[in-house]
Amino acid sequence: MTSVPAGAISKRDNVVVFDTTMRDGEQSPGASMSLEEKLELAKILEEMGVDVIEAGFPIASNGDFEAVRQIAELITESTVCGLARAAAGDIDRCAEAVRRAKRGRIHTFISTSPVHMKYKLQMEPDAVLEAITRSVSHARNLVGDVEWSAEDATRTERDFLKRCVEAAIKAGATTINLPDTVGYSYPSEYGELFRDVITSVPGADKAIFSAHCHNDLGLAVANSIAAIEGGARQVEVAINGIGERAGNAALEEIVMALRVRGDHLPYGTSVDPVHITRASRYVSAITGFPVQFNKAIVGKNAFAHESGIHQDGMLKNAETYEIMKPEDVGQGATNLVMGKHSGRHAFREKLKALGYELGQNALNDAFGRFKELADKKKHVFDDDIVALVDDALARGSEKIRVSRLRVVAGTDGQSAELTLDIDGVASTAEATGDGPVDAVFNAIHKIVPHSAALRLFQVHAVTEGTDAQAQVSVRLEEDGRIATGAAADTDTLTASAKAYVNALNNLFARKEKSRPEAAIASGF
C-alpha cells in the first residue's frame, strides 16, 4: 500500500501538529537541552511544517523563559507556545515570553480529576471552576490564542469535565486539550470521551479539541488516533516519543499513520515527512537517548529486510513488504556508496536527499570532514554522512578541541597521551586508567580540572563493518546541571574523547549563562 500524496488532502481537513519535544520531552530524566540546541531544533520543526511549537515553561526557570522568548523571535511560520499554570504570575511570565512571536499562544492548565484536586491542588471542584474562568480570561486578555488543558482528564468525572470545558470555552479558550496524563486510557474509551464532550458541551464548535497522550501502557499513538476519530483536530506529540515516564505519542508515527492510512482517516497534516529522520537523529544526538533499532518510522531496522523471502518480494515489487517508502521520511532509497573519489556536487546532492540544506561555509566544512572520513573508510554510507553532519550540529561552544590522541594498551595497563586545543593554546597530558576509555577521560581531567560526574557513556556503530564509524554519547552532571556531548569517528577512543570534550564545552557554556532557577515540573 502506498502513501496518500500530501496534496490529496485539503488544508481544512488537516490535523494540527503540536510539538512538545522541548517542554514535555525535556522532562524526560536526563533529556535537558541547551538554549542553542533548542533554537536549532525549533528551526528544524518549523522547516518540517509543525503547526505549534511548545518551547518551554517560562515560569519554571530563567533558562526556559529565555528559550521561549528567543524561539518566539526566531520562528515566523509556526505558532510558538509557552506553558503556564492557572496562576496570574505564570500567565504574565508566559505572555512576556511569547510577546514578540508572530503567532503566540499561552497554554494554561489545571488538574480536574478527584485524586488531583484532593491531594495535589487541595481544592474543591467549584474553586477549580473559578480558577479555570479566571486564568483563561486573564490569558485571553493578553493573547488571542489560548489553549486550556484539563490535567488528568481521563480520570476526571465526566459531568465535571464537561462543566470545566464549557467554562474554559466561555472564558475564551480557542483550543481545549483533554490529556491522558498518566497513560491510563484505552483507544475505544478515549475516542468516546472526545465524541461525548464535543457533542454535548455548549459552544464546543468554537474551539479545536486536542489530544495529549502518554505511553505508560504503550497506547499513546493508538489513543491519539482514536481521539482524531472522535473529533480531535490537534495532537500533542514529541520527536521519538520522548517525555515524562514512558514518553509521549511519537510525532513521526502519527504523521505517517495519517498519511499512509488516508483511506481510513481522511485527515492530513502540514508536516513534510522528508525531514522526520533528520529531526529524530538530531533529538537523539542532543539528548543522548538512542532510538531503538525496531522503532517505527525512524528506527535503524524500520526499512530493513533480512529474510530471503522478503528480499525476493522487495526486488520484484517494494510494495510487497513496505507500506511507505524510506525516502518519504528522509531515510534515503538505498545506502548509496560514497567514497574518496566523490565530488562536492555529489556530496551536496546527497545531503539534499538526506534532508539537509547547508550554507556554503557549512557545506565546505562538512565536505572537508567527509573527505577525511572517506580516506579512512572504504565505503561511506548514508548513516555515516548523517552522523558526520549531526556531530557538527550537536556541538556547542568549542573553546576546547581534541587535537591529538595516542593510546597504549597492554596486559600491564592502559595509558593515554592527549593534546587539547584550548582557545588556540595546546595542552598535553598523560594518564593511566582502568581501560583505554578511562585513561582518555583521566587525561582530559588533568588538562581541564572539573567536578562533573559521568552519568552516561554510550557507543554504537553507525554502519556495519570493521571500519564503521563509532557514535558516542556522553552525559555529565555538575551541581545539578546536565550537559550532553556527542561525536562520531572511525576510532572509538577518538570519538569518546570528542564526545566528552563536547559535553564539557556545553557544560561550561551553560554555567556561564546560568542564573538562579526555580525548577517547576508540569504534570502532563
UniProtKB/Swiss-Prot annotation:
Group of enzyme by EC: transferase
Annotated localization: Cytoplasm
Keyword Manganese: yes
Binding-site list for Mn(2+): 24, 212, 214, 248
GO molecular function annotation: 2-isopropylmalate synthase activity; acetyl-CoA C-acetyltransferase activity; manganese ion binding
UniProt main location, coarse: cytoplasm
Pathway per the UniProt entry: Amino-acid biosynthesis; L-leucine biosynthesis; L-leucine from 3-methyl-2-oxobutanoate: step 1/4
E.C. designation(s): 2.3.3.13
Entries under Pfam families matching the protein: HCS_D2, HMGL-like, LeuA_dimer
Region entry Regulatory domain, spans: 401-524
InterPro entries noted in UniProt: 2-IPM_HCS-like, 2-isopropylmalate_synth_dimer, AIPM/Hcit_synth_CS, Aldolase_TIM, LeuA/HCS_post-cat, LeuA_allosteric_dom_sf, LeuA_bact_synth, PYR_CT
Domain Pyruvate carboxyltransferase: residue ranges: 15-275
Keywords: Amino-acid biosynthesis, Branched-chain amino acid biosynthesis, Cytoplasm, Leucine biosynthesis, Manganese, Metal-binding, Transferase
Record-linked CDD domains: DRE_TIM_IPMS
Domain of life, source organism: Bacteria
Keyword check for 4Fe-4S: no
Catalytic activity annotation: 3-methyl-2-oxobutanoate + acetyl-CoA + H2O = (2S)-2-isopropylmalate + CoA + H(+)
Cofactor: Mn(2+)
Subunit record text: Homodimer.
Biological function: Catalyzes the condensation of the acetyl group of acetyl-CoA with 3-methyl-2-oxobutanoate (2-ketoisovalerate) to form 3-carboxy-3-hydroxy-4-methylpentanoate (2-isopropylmalate).
Name under which the protein is recorded: 2-isopropylmalate synthase
